[in-house]
Design a protein with these regions (language model features):
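S-adenosylmethionine/decaboxylated-SAM
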Residues: 1-147
Length: 147
């Protein structure tokens, strides 16, 4: 919705350059990857014909919204993450991984592209003392099965 927030030092130089030298981690948009809420609703409900009763849209930065809604979200079979930056990816993993069922899948869109996304997942594995096999999707995306 708001687009990407500022990256942090963990995201590396390429992310800082992409954000036009904004890299303090402020939860303010850098005006990249913006997706207005009305556009998202149009795609979901008008174009894809997804039943509105099956979708709950929560607007807000991951850091602010996920801690408040992770219990409400419930069990997850496939968790697809596309947060680009370290902090966005890390907060999603920290808040939603426990919701993923054993044998469920975690898909990370930016592992092979953004330094911060890769760092967040690698650190998460170390913290959790897990080492699942990462399966490459393409040049940037990977997925793994929750052990």
């Amino acid at each position: 919705f708001e687009g990407l927030p500022e990256p942090t030092a963990e995201d590396g130089k390429i992310a800082k350059d992409y954000a036009q030298n904004k890299a303090e981690g402020k939860l303010e948009t850098i005006n990249k990857c913006v997706g207005p809420l009305e556009d998202v609703k149009e795609i979901f409900f008008d174009i894809l014909k997804i039943n509105q009763n099956n979708v709950v849209i929560k607007k807000g930065w991951f850091q602010n919204s996920l801690p408040l809604t992770k219990q409400e979200i419930g069990k997850i079979a496939i968790l697809r993450l596309d947060g680009d930056w370290y902090e966005s990816t890390k907060v999603c993993l920290d808040n939603l991984y426990n919701n993923v069922i054993i044998g469920g899948y975690i898909v990370l869109d930016d592992y092979g592209y953004w330094e911060g996304a890769k760092r967040a997942l690698d650190e998460f594995f170390v913290e959790r003392k897990i080492s699942p096999k990462l399966i490459k999707i393409d040049d940037t995306g990977v997925y793994f099965r929750k052990p």
